[in-house]
Amino acid sequence: MENNSLHKLGIDIGSTTVKIALLDADDNILFSDYERHFANIQETLESLIRKAYDKTGDLSVCPMITGSGGLTLAKHLEVPFVQEVIAVSTALTHYAPQTDVAIELGGEDAKIIYFEGGNVEQRMNGICAGGTGSFIDQMASLIQTDATGLNEYAKSYKAIYPIAARCGVFAKTDIQPLINEGATCLLYTSPSPRDA
């Protein structure tokens, strides 16, 4: 059965993943998913849209694209583009109006957004990838797990080791010898030296 009401299709094309969310007219999420794109953005987006179609059937959609990798595709597809901080702050203001601070970890950057009296202020670390999604993935792969696996390790930690927090390169330099000594599940609850 075809549904002719207009649905919102949000597309976020980041440096490492493509994410989509399909909402009905009442802003209920009908479908959401993400996949790593491995520099194959169009194919990954097609795969996600196919999954959404398989779950929801034929729908009329109003798409919008955001994300660091989305501008070129938005122009190519003639779909509206919304800068990602505006997209995040607009969504949070609507869906979680009590929010005063939001932290977004991207694949290669980290952003913090402050909400104060109707004003939105954003700061971004785009210089170093330490603490971003890619860095977390790299650290997880060192101990042959994923980001979810890191959560499981953190739940059962037994010791805390100081790890450099200033830079991802220094953190990895601290982490690798600890892993080599067998300290796998002990690392991911470790604060930086200034927190210890």
PLM region spans:
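Short, acidic/turn-prone active-site loops that include or flank metal/cofactor-
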Residues: E35-A39, V85-A91, G126-G133
